[in-house]
Regions:
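Catalytic-core "active-site belt" of small-molecule-metabolizing enzymes
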Residues: 1-166, 170, 174, 182-209
Length: 209
């Protein structure tokens, strides 16, 4: 699956409480950015090295969808999404704050190596079934984030149509759909567990190096 991934799109501020916790305005249309493919790393129980000299590294837990084929107008989510994962959109928060102040793009804060963590991909059960289960992150055994796509400001259909219209959307693209409230910093040797419906589908530890 990983070798087939082409573009990595991310939706910012897509849960109202998360936007508020960072003192951001709630968007009136989808707010998208991207990450380079070099940022992608699978969470297979290994240690992931993150920068230790650029301020705090925050976790942002998200449902990630995988696009199965070229988008055509009128396509529904269940037609175009074949699998899903739980991911971490890791963010250099201090760097991001500086970039915001300068009104510069976020790439340095969002696109660094290993900043797009992703669990194993599992079959996508459909939107309705997906809304019946929560995704969550456990840090050192404690649940620190929990979310459900029912709470998205912009639902999966809107995200897919917006992304396709503005950037194109095809086979192998993935979309990080947004993080709920509860984001926070990572520390050296943190143990992370990515969960779907209470079951772990990815894990890793952190090495600050």
């Amino acid at each position: 699956m990983m070798k087939d991934i082409k573009n990595i799109y991310c939706v910012g501020r897509n849960y109202a409480l998360h936007a508020k916790e960072l003192n951001n305005e709630i968007p009136t249309s989808p707010f998208l950015f991207s990450k380079p493919t070099h940022s992608l790393v699978e969470a297979h129980g290994q240690s992931i090295t993150l920068p230790s000299n650029q301020g705090s590294v925050h976790f942002e837990t998200e449902l990630v969808i995988h696009i199965a084929k070229q988008f055509e107008p009128g396509m529904k989510v269940d037609e175009i999404v074949d699998s899903m994962a739980i991911g971490l959109d890791l963010t250099l928060r201090d760097v991001q704050s500086q970039l915001k102040q300068k009104q510069h793009p976020w790439l340095l804060a969002k696109g660094f190596k290993n900043s797009a963590v992703v669990s194993d991909f599992i079959p996508f059960p459909g939107v309705e079934a997906c809304e019946q289960l929560d995704f969550s992150l456990l840090k050192n055994g404690e649940r620190v984030q929990v979310g459900n796509i029912k709470d998205l400001l912009f639902d999966l259909q809107t995200i897919i149509e917006f992304t396709a219209e503005h950037f194109g959307l095809g086979k192998g693209d993935i979309i990080y759909t947004g993080t709920p409230s509860g984001v926070g910093p990572l520390s050296d040797q943190d143990q992370l567990s990515l969960n779907w419906g209470g079951n772990e589908i990815g894990s890793c530890s952190v090495t600050m190096g």
